[in-house]
Structure formats: structure tokens, C-alpha cells
Amino acid sequence: MNKERESFSGRLGFIIVSISCAIGLGNVWLMPYRTGMYGGALYILLVTAFVFLFAIPVLLTEYSVGRGSGQSGATAFEVLPPGGAWKFNGYLGIIGNYLLLMFYVMVCGFTLAYLGKGVSGSLIGLSPEEVTDSWRALTGSAGASFGLMVAIVAAGMGVTYMGLRKGIERVGKIMMGIFLVLIVILLFRSITLPGAGAGLAFLFVPNLDSMREHGTFRIIHMSMGQALFSLSVGIGSMTVFGSYVDKQRRLFRDAFTVGVLDLGVVILCLLMIFPAAFAFGISPSVGEGLIFVTLPNIFNSMPGSYIWSLLFYVGLAFVAFSTAAAVMENLTTIGMDKFGWTRKKSALVNLVLLVVLCTPSAFTRNIWAGITPPTFPHLGSFFTFLTMEIALPVGALLYVVYCTSKKGWGWDNFFKEANTGEEGWIFPASLRFYMTYILPLAIIFILIFGQVQRWILAPMGIVI
């Protein structure tokens, strides 16, 4: 165990790093294409509800467990009472973090490739069809995909190698600032394009057709997973950041702030993408390549397209990388806490391990394209399913039960830790019944019926 725990430079550093871990491509890449797939406004409303009702409370439990134990999610359950079988929750968190990076790193690699395209200007002047062909050519290249994956893993571990303040905190502050400014600029361009009104209607006028097509429980289940993924909660990714927080302030305000800021960025990203998609005749349900085929068309419609595209791809690569680095920080800390390794040794071990684990995602759209689990288009989508639909909800459930059950850490310990400090909001005791009974039962219900809809009812042609 580490004798002296690293800490953030202040509340701003804590918030920025948490936001960096939360925002990332979950908001810029996954949320837009899932919004397109599941019908727009209704999906957004459901995700918003789940952020406030599910994700923020779970985030508070992760922060509390992290600060109370002074450990990462891998060892926190061994340090805090009652120990015993709860330590296996730490192992589930380790698996969940690796699963997350097994598909996420490759998407980060694609953003790096588009940064290169932004520098070279190779997308400038292309037609919408040519932009789409460029995306397909990139994902179809095994060599390019593998090289991009290795580059992201090496860079992310390089940041964690430098330490908390010099590494992940400093990088997060710079990257998030650049990205948010660029999003706002591109948003205004997107909503002023001819035909953008249809995209705004898609985002803000509910349409029940998606419910009838995919099933109510299916969409509700996916919305819950998106909310948890959007805040990176359920697999202990945020627990480690709680362990870096001092006892000077209560945790509820910070958890709420991270949730609201994350949701705000979600809305900004959607406003940046969908009006432009409709303006250029790009289907909102185009899939995971939505941002890679929509945004170049925005730039090609703007004066000074080279400068704007370059700046945006810099920002996109930054925000994608900041999330990957934040999760890698968690894995590095796990090695330090669990095995007593130095930071440098843990970073190097994880570098090798991640290259091996992420290789299937690098090849799944090209030379291993024929190797797919049933009902999944490629291995990357299978890893996404395991993370969002299984690991995150199950992990969130275990964190909540651990913090509220007498057989776990218990409500009294959780409540005391969440409210320790002289600054910030008091987490209300009146929410005990909700946290103890309603929240865990709701997660179980949605998790079960979402999978029933996917695996049992849908193949029978039954949509509920």
C-alpha cells in the first residue's frame, strides 16, 4: 500500500478530472449515435432522468467509498468494513475498466486519425459520399487501426506515468477548456445551416416510433446504461478520484456538479451534430461513424474550413484521450494499491496488458470482421454491450447496496462520509428510503426486462 496518497491541487482539479473521465467519447461519440438509433428527443429525456435519478447517486457512492477507504475501487472493499465477499466487487470493477478500454481505446484511435486528416486537410472539399468512404477506408485498414490503438495506449500510460497533478490533472484542464470552446463555436454554425431545423425537431420533439420499433424496456434499459456510462460510474472509475479528495468538503455538491456539467456537454454535442446531419442529408441512425461523417461536412461548409476542422479535431482528440487517460489512471492506481507496485511499474505493466486486450477491437472491422458473436456486428460492439448493459448496471447496483445495506458498509458510514467536511451541500437523510430500496430495485427491474426484450421477446417478434 502507498504510505502517502496523492491528492488534487483543489476542488477545480477534482471537478475537471472527473469531468474529463465522464465526458469523453461517451457524450461526443456514443450518445449521438444512440440518440439517432433510438429516436432522438425521447431518448434524451430518458437519459436526462437517469442521470439525476440513478447516475449522480451512484457517483456519490463511488466518491464516498474512495475517500472513506483512501483506495481505488479494487482494494476499497478490502479496507472498509465488513470485507469478506464484498472484495469481489473490486475484481468486477477491474474487469469492467478493462472491458471499457477494450472498445474505447480504438474509437480514441480514430479521433487521432482524424486529427491527422485535419492537419493534412485531406477531408477539405470532399463530398458527403467521399467523406463516408474515407471513414470506411480507415476502419477497414488493420495496420492503421493497430497503430492507432498502440499510440493511444502508450500516450495514456505516459500521462499516468507522470503522476496525478503533473499528469492527468494538468492535461485534463487544458484539453477540456479547448474542447468546450470549440463545441460552442461549431454548434452555432450547425444550427444556422439551411435545413438544420429538422435536426432541432429531432432532438426536442418526442417521437414514439422508436418505442414501437425497439421496445419500451429496451430503450429504457439503453438509456440507463448511457447515463451510467456518461458519468463513468458503476465500475469504480470514479472511486479512485474520491480517494484523492481531502476531508475539507462534502461530496454531494461535487457529484451533482459533475452530473450537471456532463449533461450540459451532452446537449451541446447533440446540438452540434444533428442539425448538421439533417442539413447534409445524413441519416441520424448511420451508426458509430456519425461524428466522423457529419462533422467534416460542417467544416466544408464554413469559410476557413481548414482552420476550424484542425481546431476541432485537436479538441476531439484531447477530450477522447483525457477520458482514456483517466481510466488508465484508475488501472495504474489499482496496480499500486493491490500489488504495492510503484506508479511507473504499474503503468508499464498496464501498457503491455492493454495492447494485448485492445488488439481484437483493432482488427474487428477488418481482418477479423468475420469473427463476431451472434447478433453483434463486430467484437467492438460486443465489448460495448458487456460494458454498458451488464458491467455498469450490475456494478452500480452493488455500489448502492454496499453503501445502504447493513450487510455492506451501511447507510450510517456512507452518510457520514458523504457529509464529512465544512463546505458544500449536505446530502439529505430523507433520501435514505430511495437509496436503500427504490434505486436498487429499479436497477434490477430495468436490467432484467431490458435483457428479456433483447434476447427473448425481440427474436419472437414481440416488442413491448
Annotate each PLM feature.
Residues 1-29, 58-63, 67-80, 84-91, ...:
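Membrane-interface "cap" regions at the ends of multi-pass membrane proteins
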Residues 2-4, 8, 169, 173-321, ...:
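Membrane-embedded translocation segments of transport machinery
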Residues 2-6, 34-38, 73-92, 105-165, ...:
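Inter-helical loop and helix-membrane interface segments of multi-pass membrane transporters/permeases
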Residues 7, 13-15, 21, 146-147, ...:
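Loop-to-transmembrane helix boundary motifs in multi-pass membrane proteins
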Residues 13-50, 236-237, 242, 252-256, ...:
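Transmembrane helix-boundary motif of multi-pass solute transporters/channels
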Residues 34-38, 85-101, 136-140, 151-175, ...:
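Membrane-water interface regions at transmembrane-helix termini and the short interhelical loops
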Residues 35-61, 144-145, 388-396:
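Extracellular loop-to-transmembrane helix junctions
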Residues 89-92, 339-351, 384-443:
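C-terminal membrane-solvent junction of multi-pass transporters and transport-like membrane proteins
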